[in-house]
């Protein structure tokens, strides 16, 4: 029964991605199914959404049991002389799937809320996604890689209400006990690439 439920959740979430959105601040930055830190992490993310401009965000995340909460904020400077946007958001992540012999991936539900603030047209983002991946690395080593996919549905409110879908693909590289490097890309209505570096506690 548990196996059937897991497959149903995965199937429904992946089917949303077929329509092909982004995470809490509208940038193509996504989450692995589990955290790299024990207590908390702090770092920075640079994003290039839709090949149009660049965004810089500071990120902080802390743990509460199997749940962790992340806060992020920064600035997005679009190309073409458009006005800059202030980005503010929060994300929560909860592990819901543990790999088995029948299903090889771990999974976490990722939910968020955030906004991009601009004088002539702010937007609210409410993403809900399922991150699926698996930690890999040499035995007895602190170096690990977590490749993952995160199909996500996102509600966007910006004068009207829109439901969009995105598929996030990424990898987290834990290079030491204190440092993690990350890359992710969005496929869909919001394309682009994000690069991140965080320090772990």
Where do the language-model regions lie?
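Cleavable N-terminal export/targeting peptides
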Residues: 1-37
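Outer-membrane beta-barrel transmembrane domain signature
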Residues: 23-43, 48-52, 64, 80-81, ...
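N-terminal, post-signal-peptide region of Sec/Tat-exported proteins
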Residues: 49-77
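Metabolite-binding pocket within alpha/beta catalytic cores that recognizes anionic/polar moieties
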Residues: 74-75, 87-89
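Active-site-adjacent beta->alpha loops and helix N-cap segments on the catalytic face
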Residues: 84
């Amino acid at each position: 029964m548990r196996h059937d439920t897991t497959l149903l959740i995965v199937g429904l979430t992946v089917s949303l991605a077929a329509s092909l959105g982004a995470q809490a601040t509208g940038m193509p930055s996504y989450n692995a199914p589990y955290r790299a830190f024990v207590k908390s992490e702090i770092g920075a993310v640079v994003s290039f959404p839709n090949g149009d401009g660049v965004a810089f965000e500071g990120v902080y995340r802390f743990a509460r049991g199997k749940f962790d909460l992340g806060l992020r904020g920064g600035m997005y400077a679009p190309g073409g002389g458009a006005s800059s946007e202030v980005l503010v958001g929060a994300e929560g992540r909860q592990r819901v799937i543990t790999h088995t012999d029948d299903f090889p991936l771990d999974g976490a539900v990722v939910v968020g809320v955030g906004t991009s603030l601009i004088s002539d047209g702010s937007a609210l983002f409410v993403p809900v996604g399922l991150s699926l991946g698996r930690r890999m690395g040499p035995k007895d080593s602190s170096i690990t890689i977590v490749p993952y996919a995160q199909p996500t549905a996102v509600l966007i409110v910006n004068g009207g209400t829109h439901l969009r879908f995105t598929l996030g693909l990424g990898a987290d590289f834990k290079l030491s006990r204190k440092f993690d490097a990350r890359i992710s890309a969005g496929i869909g209505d919001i394309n682009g690439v994000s690069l991140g570096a965080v320090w772990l506690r």
